[in-house]
Amino acid sequence: MRNVYENVPSNQIEKQKRYFYGAIINCLYLWEDNSPFVDSTIQTLINQIGGSNRLFGYQPEVLTIISNLETARREPSQFRKCILDAANLVDTLKGGDSNV
């Protein structure tokens, strides 16, 4: 996929996708450990993913990932599902060499 940053190599985009996937999954571990940093970690992810929107060519999945993360913050009963949905959506983003 050709990205809007002409000089960004696809392997760097792939590494960013892997980072997002791992960071989102890490929220599950924080949640299970009752970490006081769950909320701030999710907010940081929302900011990072939102900031990468242009890099991923304004794909609609970016908004859905952010929406899932926000719902995870606000609806504890939906936390696990929303986090897993967000992580799986990272895999659907076009860009990079392969899927996460």
Residue locations for each model-derived region?
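Short terminal alpha-helical segments
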Residues: 1-37, 87
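Positively charged, low-complexity intrinsically disordered regions
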Residues: 3, 13, 17-19, 49, ...
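Compositionally biased non-globular segments, especially hydrophobic aliphatic-rich helices
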Residues: 13, 26, 44-47, 75, ...
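Non-catalytic, well-ordered alpha-helical scaffold segments
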Residues: 18-25, 43, 63, 80, ...
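Alpha-helical repeat scaffolds in large eukaryotic proteins
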Residues: 28-32, 50, 70, 91
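Acidic, low-complexity, intrinsically disordered interaction modules
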Residues: 37-78
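Amphipathic alpha-helical binding modules
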Residues: 64-100
